[in-house]
A protein has these predicted regions:
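Conserved ABC ATPase signature
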Residues: 129-133
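Conserved ABC ATPase "signature" region
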Residues: 96, 100, 107-125, 176
Length: 186
């Protein structure tokens, strides 16, 4: 997997959020560091095709991601800073619902949901309603939904926000394991 940002710029009126960025990423973990307003989330949103660049391009294995359309989005797992969920759904129901939206076959989804619930440490609360979860537990459910389709590119915007120190360690280990087979952008 190779993702390239080619002279990428994103402007909002007179404000330049991303300015002529050129870089190449392959499998592994990449962390974006910068002050608030530095363009990290904007860059992630462009990578996830939620924003179009003002100029420049983003390619995946040599193809423009905006031209790839659903072919590209099938390679992608995304956890935004703030994500929506149905508060009345249980963790398991929420993940099954998201799996169906991602086109994961029901038999595969059932197995994958069980596996991911365990991986992110939510087995004991799998049947609890989302509205009853702590902020850290909701975040872990969000991480699980991003991984449902076994993405080749995993984009996680502030993934450890709300996680306690032990969960941060578990998360770092999980990301290390996942990055062997995919590109992970934090």
């Amino acid at each position: 997997m190779e993702v390239k940002f080619n002279d990428l710029t994103k402007k909002f009126g007179n404000f330049t959020a991303v300015d002529h960025l050129t870089m190449t990423m392959t499998n592994g973990v990449y962390g974006l560091l910068g002050v608030n307003g530095a363009g990290k989330t904007t860059m992630m949103r462009m990578l996830c095709t939620l924003l179009k660049p003002t100029s420049g391009s983003i390619t995946c294995n040599g193809k423009d991601i905006f031209e790839m359309d659903s072919e590209y989005r099938n390679l992608l797992g995304y956890l935004p800073q703030d994500f929506g969920f149905y508060p009345e759904f249980t963790v398991q129901d929420y993940l099954m619902y998201i799996a169906s939206l991602k086109g994961v076959r029901p038999a595969v989804a059932k197995k994958r949901v069980k596996e991911l619930i365990s991986k992110v440490g939510l087995s004991k609360v799998a049947n609890r309603k989302m509205k009853k979860l702590s902020g850290g537990m909701k975040r872990r459910a969000g991480i699980a939904q991003a991984m449902l389709n076994n993405p080749a590119i995993l984009v996680l915007d502030e993934p450890t926000a709300g996680l306690d120190p032990n969960e941060r360690i578990r998360f770092r280990n999980l990301i290390s394991e996942l990055s062997e087979e995919r590109l992970v952008l934090l």
